[in-house]
Amino acid sequence: MANMTSSVSASQVAGELASATFEEIPALVEHYREDPRQQVIKACERALKRHAKELAERERVNGMYQLMHELGGDGVVVGVDEVGRGSVAGPLTVCAVCLPMEPRIWGINDSKKLTPARRELLSVKIAEVATAIGFCHIAPADIDEMGMARAIRTAVAGAVADTGLEPDCVLLDGNPLGAVP
């Protein structure tokens, strides 16, 4: 280590590691790995932990894209997610989205597993890259009249139709539906 301790403060190193991108972390940790300062050692440990967590997340998302490719091949795959469950929870809303294989959207997940802030951020990213998006809303009174199972089927079919696509495969919460609704 070439006199690193005198040229860069431990706080600066910690800040650099904290703001590093996923791609930058390995090289930065390697660069600072022999720095004996406790603050730098801890910052490297935190960065490596963050990198490992992000790597696991990217592997999960890559698995979703791989499933999408396996099920749809070169055809059209539409992912569907629903929110709301009947008159107690309000209306049922279903969104159908067709995403290209690239660019990958890291962090994409079932809406119920995301914080409101993360949902908002991802909705912007999805809107930027989606080849098609469709929605369907079912009012609470209609859900009560037709029943939840039929309301979900109706909303999924409506959202898929709203995309304007004829999908080869539809995924509901990441699971393939037996047949296109």
Residue ranges and their predicted role:
Residues 1-78, 82, 88-181:
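Acidic (Asp/Glu) carboxylate-rich active-site/surface patches
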